[in-house]
Amino acid sequence: QHIGMAGQRVCYTIHNFKHQGITGEHVLYAAGLPHPHHLFQPERLQDDFNHAAINLMKGGVVYSNFVTTVSPKHAHEVMYTDQGHGLGHTLNVHQRKFGGILNGLDYDVWNTEVDELIPVRYGVDDLEKKYDNKAALRHRLLLREEFKPVIAYVGRLDAQKGVHLIRHGLHYALGSGAQFVLLGSSPDADIDREFWHLKHHFNNNPDCHLEIGYDEELAHLIYAGADMVIMPSMFEPCGLTQLIALKYGTVPIVRGVGGLIDTVFDRDYSDKPEHERNGYMFYQTDEQGLDSAMVRAVGLWQHHPEDFRQLCQASANSDVGH
């Protein structure tokens, strides 16, 4: 009221439901709010599980005019599965003002036609120029020039991203006649140590390169030069990796959760029209699930190159992330 917002409408967007701002009710008094005890009610800010605490995210849901998350599928997940981290009841009570709006990309940054960080720019109609970027990627990472697909992972290395499947994907790629590149780091010391060990183990392998850390220019080159990216997330509110991959004509191989379901449509099993099918999907959390998708993707690249080229075209034409 003091800053003239008493009559304004409020839209509250939530990306991660895990961090809810659960704290003691003393915060309400410290904030100088009038009649704070009125807010400490089950239908307002009182946490649904710890009745001695307030839940600031719950309060945001209750008092906002509209609440969004970053994909339609994730909106369903947080209402009806444990991905709501205890807020499912509140979201269901307020479901008329809650929905998912798909995330998008900044096309001033992620756009193959104007990307200054890749050696050769290209568009939907000249995807064959990806091969020039693939050659540049191999040259930079000291991979050998062979008739092999390049499979990549770009992103954080942690449990949410399916780190056990990322590791398995590396081994599967090399065992199936593909090359594998990784760009990522982990906030977890044990995971970070594990991937440094893998990096040293594969240091002299001409079909594998692991870059621990983050390099913006290399990230762009990987998206432009790789044939496929893997994204075996355990949960994914939206995901940007698959959106970038699609824009760059790079086929995503994803686990069917959250925003990945809203953006990636399996080439073989989706009920979408064929021209809208743009990648591969699996649902299990084990290695066999990832295998089932990777074997189809690698097999298409190896044995049906024209069909794979058409899939890349469909990926680049995907109407997502806008």
Question: What does each of the following model-derived ranges do?
Answer:
Residues 1-322:
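Catalytic cores of nucleotide-sugar-dependent glycosyltransferases that transfer UDP/GDP/TDP-activated
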